[in-house]
Amino acid sequence: MDTLLKTPNKLEFLHPVHGFSVKASSFNSVKPHKFGSRKICENWGKGVCVKAKSSALLELVPETKKENLDFELPMYDPSKGLVVDLAVVGGGPAGLAVAQQVSEAGLSVVSIDPSPKLIWPNNYGVWVDEFEAMDLLDCLDATWSGTVVYIDDNTTKDLDRPYGRVNRKQLKSKMMQKCILNGVKFHHAKVIKVIHEEAKSMLICNDGVTIQATVVLDATGFSRCLVQYDKPYKPGYQVAYGILAEVEEHPFDTSKMVLMDWRDSHLGNNMELKERNRKVPTFLYAMPFSSNKIFLEETSLVARPGLRMDDIQERMVARLNHLGIKVKSIEEDEHCVIPMGGSLPVIPQRVVGTGGTAGLVHPSTGYMVARTLAAAPVVANAIIHYLGSEKDLLGNELSAAVWKDLWPIERRRQREFFCFGMDILLKLDLPATRRFFDAFFDLEPRYWHGFLSSRLYLPELIFFGLSLFSRASNTSRIEIMTKGTLPLVNMINNLLQDTE
């Protein structure tokens, strides 16, 4: 799944280096929390197999390593004092995608990031058809012909929809090379302040450099470096712990990606942990690359407050023990927290947002990378159009027009429905969650495909909801009616208040 934000084990949002939705992995210096009281030997030898147990598994996490792209970047020259058309704050997929497309139109663009050549540490999983539509199939380093969902020990859903893992080095290289070819300049710094004038904005960087731009794009992820909010931000949280590991063996079919494994038989001997999992369930997400290399991630789909990281790690250890997965080595690990739902930023406002900054994460699933990349042409084309239009839009008027194109009313209504879905999921325990997904993946593919990929709009979403309700068990229908009534009322009220 998309992994976007680094946290320690308590859900404390760190003040991040802008431009990176910070995520703990082997690419940073945050040490994983060691849980369990068993003392661990210091000298695990190379090739030693470790049956997942207490903190022994985490002792295999490698030391920090950072990998940079191996090519030179054209740097921004502050001595010229030029006003660029677009300043992009943040060098993640969201920011680079817009920078690439705006610069293709011949506009001047500067990308500001403290580590512009650093390869993203995030693990991104996407539906293959989403990347195919954007001509990005060459940026997938592994694909599976389908996915599987384990509802419980007796019910399995085989989904005929190919899935892939993003090659983050290839994706960033491809985007950066196009930016360079188009004349994008890069500045190695962090933006600490923005000052707006009538027709331009001045970005003050931590190295003392001031960059002037007609349009400012905040692509800093959930740090929300420049974009402003005027409502309480109360999202749900998707929390996960994952490892890319070499194992002796694993029980999964290497031709299928495990989208969700809701089984809890691994908790049979630990009633306290089983009860916690019943109340706030977690599932396994797994990418089997071969018979002995696999990405494993224990995930809480959405909770408020989010689960503690050590709780999730404990559940993962119990699951791996039960599955007989013996870890030989860990190539990288990740702690991720994805805020889901919550209020949108102030719309419109002078700084334009994209990606996590602009609320593009799917409130019901946590998916974002494909949605963000698909939204890049919308943002880029709006900037290109309004900068070059005869209307002579500048400053607040120009930004307002771009925001309107990014969040038209049909997209806002769609997001409201997705938040309604999240509010229901927040209330479901493990049995109810199983019943929900048993019905969800029995829907016609066009419905569940469209829901997961943000392709359904409100009229279609209403039919989606009715279809889901009709396929649900009687127990699940009662749960949806009792637990979904208040979220439904809130959604309808928000829809009525939100007008053009």
UniProtKB/Swiss-Prot annotation:
Domain of life: Eukaryota
Keywords, ordered alphabetically: Carotenoid biosynthesis, Chloroplast, Isomerase, NAD, Plastid, Transit peptide
Location within or outside the cell: Plastid, Chloroplast
The enzyme's E.C. designation: 5.5.1.19
Binding site for NAD(+): 86-114
Keyword Ribonucleoprotein: no
GO biological process: carotene biosynthetic process; ubiquinone biosynthetic process; xanthophyll biosynthetic process
One Pfam assignment: Lycopene_cycl
Catalytic reaction equation(s): a carotenoid psi-end group = a carotenoid beta-end derivative
Top enzyme category: isomerase
GO CC annotation terms, alphabetical: chloroplast; mitochondrion
Main location class: plastid
The keyword Chloroplast belongs to this UniProt entry's keyword annotation: yes
Molecular functions (GO terms): lycopene beta cyclase activity; oxidoreductase activity; oxidoreductase activity, acting on paired donors, with incorporation or reduction of molecular oxygen
Pathway the protein takes part in: Carotenoid biosynthesis; beta-carotene biosynthesis; Carotenoid biosynthesis; beta-zeacarotene biosynthesis
Transit peptide: 1-81
Family designation: Belongs to the lycopene cyclase family.
Task of the protein: Catalyzes the double cyclization reaction which converts lycopene to beta-carotene and neurosporene to beta-zeacarotene.
PANTHER family reported in the protein's UniProt record: OS02G0190600 PROTEIN, PTHR39757
Protein name from the UniProt record: Lycopene beta cyclase, chloroplastic
Organism listed in the record: Nicotiana tabacum (Common tobacco)
